[in-house]
Amino acid sequence: MKVFDSLKALEKTKEFIDWRTNNKEYYLVSLFYISDKPNEIQIDYYNSKKNTITSFNYSKNSVFVVKDSQVMSKTKKELKPLVLEGISEFDNALETALSYKKEKHSKEEVYKTIIILQNDDTITKEGRIIWNIIFITNSFKVINYKLDAKNLELLSQNINSIFSFIQK
């Protein structure tokens, strides 16, 4: 999938242009892909004054807009804008994560893939744009790789049971 082409195409749609006319203070904060919807990408814009996100679910045939959702965050940190200059393509990031998975967890069969391009300030104080790639497996495990979005360096990796995310 060419996510940057999808972003450019979204920005040319009537829905986006009409929305952007009255919402200039919003800026791009994330791109979200889930393998259940292989031809769709969610593109998120953030308003720091309102602490809200407007999401565009974009595919070649449609645009669905979810306006002004409140940001749920424990830290109340302002989301940083995505600067796309020099960012590696989606397909290259996925290929890199799959090679790590093959090397470390080759027996785990992937059921679902989630890929997010986002700023992450848990890695460095100033933040870093990352490809956050999550594989959910048939054996109820979650394999997570965080890759530097520019050079695809592996920044962190972990594997957990999906049940570890359930609050008791």
Q: Could you describe each region identified by the protein language model?
A:
Residues 1-168:
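Long, terminal "pre-/pro-" and other extracytoplasmic accessory regions
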